[in-house]
Amino acid sequence: MPNSLVYKKGIDLKKAPILMYGYGSYGSIIDASFRKTMLPLLNRGFIFCISHIRGGSEMGRQWYEDGKMFKKKNTFYDFIDSTKGLIQENIGDPKNIFALGGSAGGLLMGAIINYEPELYKGIISAVPFVDVLTTMSDESI
């Protein structure tokens, strides 16, 4: 699974907490660009990981197609596999993994915490898109 990692030079990668970020929707490409909002976490020894999961189009059109509609579960499984892949590579403390996603990434957070509740120590689901039927039926938005 393609990931982008950033961390402070000199940290012990095996013992560092991880903040996983995922979106995986609408073909959006999540660039691995500098985010000053991550500095407080990085200065505290965190690893920040952007997981480039299906539903985004980082790997092309088919990558996007394979993460939408009836294939949406691929997005969720990709994120979980991305997390487990880091653990297998001895990157990060497996007891201190957190996940972050907003809007459609909030839907992702809801899914992963239901599929693998023991894998993540905490979840941040910012403005989650989790009540699809009500949201899509609301004519005011």
What is each PLM-predicted segment?
Residues 1-98, 102-103, 115, 130-131, ...:
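Cap/lid segment of the alpha/beta-hydrolase catalytic domain
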Residues 101-109, 123:
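Gly/Ala-rich beta-loop-alpha elbow adjacent to hydrolase catalytic centers
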Residues 106-118:
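Short glycine-enriched nucleophile-adjacent loop
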